[in-house]
Amino acid sequence: EKYPKRCNALILRGIFLCRPQEIEWFLYGMRTVFPDHWEVFAGHLPPQERCDLLTNYYRRLIDPDPNVHMPAALAWSRYEGACSTLLSDSKIAEEFQRKELALGLARIEAHYFVNQIFLPEDALLKNVDRVRSIPGIIVQRR
């Protein structure tokens, strides 16, 4: 949105605007669709820390000790991978358990969530007129 003249076209996939309600859905709401995966995700934290999954996961993810951050990263990434498709996919599950992917994915997502993607709330939607003339396609899968 900041430099629309530098963009010829948009191909969008997995649209997530990082609004508070979307973060809430990721952290808590998806338990209505994937209760088993959510239980494992939330169960990584002690019961007294489950009321604020983001803060407590983030604290672990930024801990310099691999014995602290890697289990949290793997739990976060496993949850993300398991909930990214409607039906279980062993290849996706395996990919999301790669340590390199898990740590980067979990840290980046949690960092952006904690910082509201470094933008004022709804900034992307409020400024959509800036990119309205750019051709685009949304690729979405089940």
Residue ranges of model-derived segments:
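Active-site nucleophile elbow and catalytic-triad environment of alpha/beta-hydrolase enzymes
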Residues: H111-V128
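Secondary-structure capping and boundary motifs in well-ordered enzyme cores
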Residues: R98-L105, D129-R130
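Short, hydrophobic/amphipathic alpha-helical patches that form generic packing surfaces
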Residues: A75-T85, L103-V114
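Generic, well-ordered alpha-helical scaffold segments in large soluble proteins
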Residues: K2, R6, Y112, R130-V131
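Short beta-strand/loop motif that positions the catalytic acidic residue
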Residues: V131-R132, I137-Q140
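Generic recognition of stable, solvent-exposed alpha-helical segments in well-folded globular domains
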Residues: D52, P71, G104, A123-K126
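Accessory cap/linker subdomain of secreted extracellular hydrolases
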Residues: T55-F96
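A catalytic-pocket lid/entrance helix-loop region that shapes and gates access to the active site
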Residues: K2-Y58
